[in-house]
């Protein structure tokens, strides 16, 4: 059963990884004509983009800038809606994926798609929900109606930065929770990590211009809970492996796809230093990823910090 209220469209998806492939299935199920472009394969990008009404970027963070530049060189009509579905931060300019796309296409309708969306569950037909956020409400509604179904519910938001940062920042906290579970520290410790992790996300997001209340929604708390409570989460898997005492290189080699939190942590630490934001959990995750501490030492530092109000 189709629940979208838009006529069939052509949707181009950049990135053939787990998330890009899942989005393609969702769009095809709604009767749209979908073409997926993978930069590792010999596909004509111009042909993929031609006639598309919606362009979804689901490439890894490392691929966002080069792919955006290739698309800019090919060119797209001004009415094409750009959708950013990547969760990461640019390590050089400290930008979000949507900010990179926005800089490359300043006059294009731009939408952020984010939420608690584990690809494997969606591909199994299990129900899920997400948020499409944009300063252009019309664009957000177009994407909402194009992709929503009886198994994939979409909400709109006018806070694209908050929606995007929620999906980005929770990846680092998920690594911490994975470590916690590997050390068998219990439910109390896990609850404390998730709750204080959300507080860190809100501090960073609000300082950067996002609305604090956005982080209490699907793209913030919702995504945080899904990522921290599922062994399907790559970031959780990284933390669990580190908590078992395995080297990061080995853990990453055994994971399918990209654990963006590994590359997000140092960027968040840099942003926090620039803006004087307290991010103790993220700092300990960063030290652990750099091999500068052990899981037990990181825990001790978190527990022995100066006492303060919540």
Swiss-Prot record:
Keywords: Cytoplasm, Lipid biosynthesis, Lipid metabolism, NAD, NADP, Nucleotide-binding, Oxidoreductase, Phospholipid biosynthesis, Phospholipid metabolism. The gene is gpsA. This is Glycerol-3-phosphate dehydrogenase [NAD(P)+]. One of its GO terms (molecular function) is NAD binding. Its main location: cytoplasm. InterPro entries: 6-PGluconate_DH-like_C_sf, 6PGD_dom2, G3P_DH_NAD-dep, G3P_DH_NAD-dep_C, G3P_DH_NAD-dep_N, NAD(P)-bd_dom_sf. GO terms for cellular component: cytosol. Its EC number is 1.1.1.94. The keyword S-adenosyl-L-methionine does not apply. The active site is at 170 (proton acceptor). Sn-glycerol 3-phosphate binds at residues 87, 115, 170, 223, 233-235. Catalyzes the reduction of the glycolytic intermediate dihydroxyacetone phosphate (DHAP) to sn-glycerol 3-phosphate (G3P), the key precursor for phospholipid synthesis. The keyword Calcium does not apply. Pathway: Membrane lipid metabolism; glycerophospholipid metabolism. PANTHER family: GLYCEROL-3-PHOSPHATE DEHYDROGENASE (PTHR11728), GLYCEROL-3-PHOSPHATE DEHYDROGENASE [NAD(+)] 2, CHLOROPLASTIC (PTHR11728:SF1). It catalyses: sn-glycerol 3-phosphate + NAD(+) = dihydroxyacetone phosphate + NADH + H(+); sn-glycerol 3-phosphate + NADP(+) = dihydroxyacetone phosphate + NADPH + H(+). NADPH binds at residues 19, 39-40, 87, 119, 234, 260.
